Protein backbone atom coordinates (compact mmCIF):
# COMPACT_ATOMS: atom_id res chain seq x y z
CA UNK A 1 0.00 0.00 0.00
CA UNK A 2 1.23 3.49 -0.82
CA UNK A 3 0.99 6.12 1.93
CA UNK A 4 1.51 9.88 2.07
CA UNK A 5 1.56 11.95 5.26
CA UNK A 6 0.68 15.52 6.13
CA UNK A 7 2.19 16.89 9.35
CA UNK A 8 0.71 20.07 10.86
CA UNK A 9 2.28 19.91 14.32
CA UNK A 10 5.67 21.40 15.27
CA UNK A 11 8.74 19.35 16.11
CA UNK A 12 8.27 20.09 19.82
CA UNK A 13 5.27 21.09 21.91
CA UNK A 14 2.75 18.56 20.60
CA UNK A 15 2.76 14.83 19.87
CA UNK A 16 1.78 15.20 16.20
CA UNK A 17 5.22 15.24 14.57
CA UNK A 18 6.73 12.49 16.70
CA UNK A 19 3.66 10.30 16.13
CA UNK A 20 3.96 10.96 12.40
CA UNK A 21 7.62 9.93 12.35
CA UNK A 22 6.87 6.75 14.32
CA UNK A 23 3.99 5.97 11.95
CA UNK A 24 6.25 6.56 8.93
CA UNK A 25 8.88 4.20 10.32
CA UNK A 26 6.23 1.54 11.03
CA UNK A 27 4.75 1.85 7.53
CA UNK A 28 8.16 1.30 5.97
CA UNK A 29 9.04 -1.54 8.37
CA UNK A 30 5.87 -3.36 7.30
CA UNK A 31 6.94 -3.18 3.65
CA UNK A 32 4.56 -0.45 2.53
CA UNK A 33 5.61 2.54 0.46
CA UNK A 34 5.79 6.08 1.84
CA UNK A 35 5.97 8.43 -1.10
CA UNK A 36 6.19 11.76 0.68
CA UNK A 37 5.59 13.79 3.80
CA UNK A 38 4.11 17.28 3.46
CA UNK A 39 4.67 19.69 6.36
CA UNK A 40 2.05 22.42 6.63
CA UNK A 41 1.14 25.17 9.10
CA UNK A 42 3.14 24.68 12.34
CA UNK A 43 4.57 21.49 10.87
CA UNK A 44 7.13 23.53 8.92
CA UNK A 45 9.10 23.91 12.15
CA UNK A 46 10.18 20.28 11.64
CA UNK A 47 12.56 21.59 8.95
CA UNK A 48 14.29 24.28 11.02
CA UNK A 49 17.96 23.28 11.24
CA UNK A 50 18.47 25.67 14.16
CA UNK A 51 16.25 23.56 16.41
CA UNK A 52 18.40 22.35 19.29
CA UNK A 53 16.69 19.90 21.66
CA UNK A 54 18.10 19.06 25.08
CA UNK A 55 20.75 16.33 25.12
CA UNK A 56 18.31 13.81 26.62
CA UNK A 57 15.57 14.47 24.00
CA UNK A 58 15.15 12.84 20.61
CA UNK A 59 16.20 15.16 17.76
CA UNK A 60 13.08 15.03 15.63
CA UNK A 61 14.42 17.33 12.89
CA UNK A 62 17.38 15.01 12.31
CA UNK A 63 15.03 12.03 12.59
CA UNK A 64 13.08 13.28 9.58
CA UNK A 65 16.33 13.98 7.77
CA UNK A 66 17.49 10.41 8.43
CA UNK A 67 14.20 9.09 6.99
CA UNK A 68 14.92 11.04 3.82
CA UNK A 69 18.52 9.86 3.61
CA UNK A 70 17.98 6.18 4.42
CA UNK A 71 14.57 5.55 2.84
CA UNK A 72 14.39 8.20 0.12
CA UNK A 73 11.15 9.67 1.46
CA UNK A 74 10.49 13.12 0.01
CA UNK A 75 10.06 15.81 2.68
CA UNK A 76 8.05 18.76 1.35
CA UNK A 77 7.63 22.00 3.30
CA UNK A 78 4.84 24.41 2.36
CA UNK A 79 6.76 27.45 1.13
CA UNK A 80 4.13 30.01 2.19
CA UNK A 81 3.76 28.56 5.70
CA UNK A 82 7.54 28.25 6.05
CA UNK A 83 8.32 31.83 5.09
CA UNK A 84 5.62 33.15 7.46
CA UNK A 85 7.33 31.24 10.26
CA UNK A 86 10.91 32.15 9.42
CA UNK A 87 12.03 28.95 7.70
CA UNK A 88 13.86 29.63 4.42
CA UNK A 89 16.29 27.97 2.03
CA UNK A 90 19.27 29.79 0.47
CA UNK A 91 17.28 31.02 -2.53
CA UNK A 92 14.42 32.48 -0.50
CA UNK A 93 16.79 33.95 2.10
CA UNK A 94 18.67 35.84 -0.62
CA UNK A 95 15.46 36.93 -2.36
CA UNK A 96 14.03 38.29 0.88
CA UNK A 97 17.29 39.79 2.14
CA UNK A 98 17.47 37.53 5.19
CA UNK A 99 20.75 37.06 7.04
CA UNK A 100 20.82 33.32 6.34
CA UNK A 101 18.94 30.15 5.55
CA UNK A 102 17.78 27.58 8.09
CA UNK A 103 16.10 24.85 6.04
CA UNK A 104 17.48 21.48 7.15
CA UNK A 105 19.15 19.38 4.45
CA UNK A 106 16.75 16.80 3.01
CA UNK A 107 13.69 19.08 3.09
CA UNK A 108 12.35 20.91 0.03
CA UNK A 109 10.27 24.09 -0.08
CA UNK A 110 7.19 23.21 -2.16
CA UNK A 111 3.79 24.56 -3.03
CA UNK A 112 0.43 22.95 -2.33
CA UNK A 113 0.77 21.21 -5.68
CA UNK A 114 3.13 18.73 -4.00
CA UNK A 115 0.39 17.89 -1.49
CA UNK A 116 -2.19 17.52 -4.26
CA UNK A 117 0.14 15.25 -6.24
CA UNK A 118 0.75 13.08 -3.17
CA UNK A 119 -2.99 12.81 -2.52
CA UNK A 120 -3.66 11.78 -6.12
CA UNK A 121 -0.98 9.10 -6.24
CA UNK A 122 -1.31 7.40 -2.84
CA UNK A 123 -3.74 4.83 -1.48
CA UNK A 124 -3.93 6.47 1.96
CA UNK A 125 -3.28 10.05 3.07
CA UNK A 126 -2.80 10.35 6.83
CA UNK A 127 -2.74 13.69 8.66
CA UNK A 128 -1.00 14.33 11.98
Curated annotation (Swiss-Prot):
<dbReference type="GO" id="GO:0002143">
    <property type="term" value="P:tRNA wobble position uridine thiolation"/>
</dbReference>
<keyword id="KW-0819">tRNA processing</keyword>
<dbReference type="GO" id="GO:0016783">
    <property type="term" value="F:sulfurtransferase activity"/>
</dbReference>
<protein>
    <recommendedName>
        <fullName>Sulfurtransferase TusD</fullName>
        <ecNumber>2.8.1.-</ecNumber>
    </recommendedName>
</protein>
<feature type="active site" description="Cysteine persulfide intermediate">
    <location>
        <position position="78"/>
    </location>
</feature>
<dbReference type="Pfam" id="PF02635">
    <property type="entry name" value="DsrE"/>
</dbReference>
<dbReference type="InterPro" id="IPR017463">
    <property type="entry name" value="Sulphur_relay_TusD/DsrE"/>
</dbReference>
<comment type="subunit">
    <text>Heterohexamer, formed by a dimer of trimers. The hexameric TusBCD complex contains 2 copies each of TusB, TusC and TusD. The TusBCD complex interacts with TusE.</text>
</comment>
<dbReference type="InterPro" id="IPR027396">
    <property type="entry name" value="DsrEFH-like"/>
</dbReference>
<keyword id="KW-0808">Transferase</keyword>
<dbReference type="InterPro" id="IPR003787">
    <property type="entry name" value="Sulphur_relay_DsrE/F-like"/>
</dbReference>
<comment type="function">
    <text>Part of a sulfur-relay system required for 2-thiolation of 5-methylaminomethyl-2-thiouridine (mnm(5)s(2)U) at tRNA wobble positions. Accepts sulfur from TusA and transfers it in turn to TusE.</text>
</comment>
<dbReference type="GO" id="GO:1990228">
    <property type="term" value="C:sulfurtransferase complex"/>
</dbReference>
<keyword id="KW-0963">Cytoplasm</keyword>
<comment type="similarity">
    <text>Belongs to the DsrE/TusD family.</text>
</comment>
<dbReference type="GO" id="GO:0097163">
    <property type="term" value="F:sulfur carrier activity"/>
</dbReference>
Amino acid sequence: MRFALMVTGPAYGTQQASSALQFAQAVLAEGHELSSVFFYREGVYNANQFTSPASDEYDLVRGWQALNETQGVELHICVAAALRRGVADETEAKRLGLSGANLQHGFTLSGLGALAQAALTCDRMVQF
